[in-house]
UniProtKB/Swiss-Prot annotation:
Catalyzes the conversion of xanthine monophosphate (XMP) to GMP in the presence of glutamine and ATP through an adenyl-XMP intermediate. Signal peptide: none annotated. One of its GO terms (molecular function) is GMP synthase (glutamine-hydrolyzing) activity. It comes from Mus musculus. Its EC number is 6.3.5.2. This is GMP synthase [glutamine-hydrolyzing]. It is an enzyme of class 6 (ligase). It catalyses: XMP + L-glutamine + ATP + H2O = GMP + L-glutamate + AMP + diphosphate + 2 H(+). Optimum pH is 7.6. The gene is Gmps. The active site is at residues 104, 190, 192. The modification N6-acetyllysine is found at residue 9.
Amino acid sequence: MALCNGDSKPENAGGDLKDGSHHYEGAVVILDAGAQYGKVIDRRVRELFVQSEIFPLETPAFAIKEQGFRAIIISGGPNSVYAEDAPWFDPAIFTIGKPILGICYGMQMMNKVFGGTVHKKSVREDGVFNISMDNTCSLFRGLQKEEIVLLTHGDSVDKVADGFKVVARSGNIVAGIANESKKLYGVQFHPEVGLTENGKVILKNFLYDIAGCSGNFTVQNRELECIREIKEKVGTSKVLVLLSGGVDSTVCTALLNRALNQDQVIAVHIDNGFMRKRESQSVEEALKKLGIQVKVINAAHSFYNGTTTLPISDEDRTPRKRISKTLNMTTSPEEKRKIIGDTFVKIANEVIGEMSLKPEEVFLAQGTLRPDLIESASLVASGKAELIKTHHNDTELIRKLREEGKVIEPLKDFHKDEVRILGRELDLPEELVSRHPFPGPGLAIRVICAEEPYICKDFPETNNILKIVADFSASVKKPHTLLQRVKACTTEEDQEKLMQITSLHSLNAFLLPIKTVGVQGDCRSYSYVCGISSKDEPDWESLIFLARLIPRMCHNINRVVYIFGPPVKEPPTDVTPTFLTTGVLSTLRQADFEAHNILRESGFAGKISQMPVILTPLHFDRDPLQKQPSCQRSVVIRTFITSDFMTGVPATPGNEIPVEVVLKMVTEIKKIPGISRIMYDLTSKPPGTTEWE
């Protein structure tokens, strides 16, 4: 049986339940196996007005039973159930008579406990898939026999445990199992994320029909809880809140103002030099209209030249540290974020000093959201979540302040759409509540900095696979070992569609010599971008299909872009040296301004959740024989549609955004000096994150 390879229980097993001080009658316990989507499960359950609490996977069964939980949900996680370091759990949770829903890793765990087997498949599934369902199963009642879901896994159920039946399949892969008499259900996909179209129906079936929950957990309760927590923690002390002007920090400040006296709240807007065009001025004006007095600090010089302390190397587990390069000479995305986060804190401390306040009597408030903490693998969000990227508001220094109890984060249990609802409850104006998010590090994380191209040993082989994919209809006539790999990673339906697309369109697909951050299978991926160009007018539906298919076949690719303009004859294999210098930032600032101005004027800004505009160090259209150096850069437009920012899809031109609007953006951005090409990000999340860094 799976007691983390069967042996001993860890000393801290049981979380906060074992003291018996709480009672959760009617609530659902989510046992956290380390999933990036763990808190999304929590949010989806609460959206259905059912109270949920998250505890470690190793929480003992007796504690769950004694505390009155009505049902159990086991999250996904990055481990294999057979790994030596697989997390410990109490198998008795399956024998206490509580309905259980196992998601991804949770399903594999359930299957293994009851005698089934799990093994690593040759093909990962990362992305959106059509799966078949048995809609006579209580879990899938009211659904179609085929549904669109998000799958992100490498291990799969092989032999189904006795007493369970298969209730969903993705091709020949088991996607759902059930033992209805014991109310035990497992799904390989993620019903909690927006990319699973009817995931909420599945969760509702489990919570209401199977577990018998009642819906009496409301947003108003959570607002009151936030205010109570602020009052209790701050008392008569002062709070310094860093305001970006976005919805998160504004709602955070509104909560502080409601909970505390006005003279206790010190609102500061720091212009870090990475703001959008005229951003700081508009932030100050908007907040003054709300009656919030803001101290604006121009700290661009401090950020450009900022440094921080870092481990000697990623492998070095000793406490030894090194001083980083200055930010304007740094190319590592992780180091950039850490420098920016720590510089924010240093400047906040300077403000405290200038105002003659005692540091020990001042709290730092942030509008940190749940996705920030999950992607940073913060213990506040999840004790096991794998690091995807460091967020500027969750650096080591911030964590140290948090450990000291000096950080106030009233929105730490909220996701973006919930913050908007809360903002409306607090009577904030709609233009602020519905504003597109803008990251605290600003344009700094929208410049792909590089000194040299990113080309590893797998670069040539991956390019050969992409050539086969882009010309699949011709490639199938010429036997090749890599062709067999492509076929092994795709279904017959995929191959038929690929044949159709490549017969109709002349495509060129290749790797770009840069890397961006992504997420695959609950873990961080940091890898290549695939570019697609064509002499034909773009068929956007086909391009979106290719963007889903390519990362499934090539796990070293986490992003796919379409390159506007004529076919790329000679893909770049070098880069334009790019750092966070004023000239580089000025170029991106203008591109961002043009794109967002066109989106606003089109009236479609409300249809798009966020639209990062990214500057890459890529110079196309150079004759290699002339050995022209790389000196221009290219821009990426990243439209993104999501409900929670944990998963999402690009806006498809012609559907969610008019083609003419996108083409107008391309035309205006191309006029900016030093711009080589414009690209359109076709990638969903996963495998690509919202931002490129």
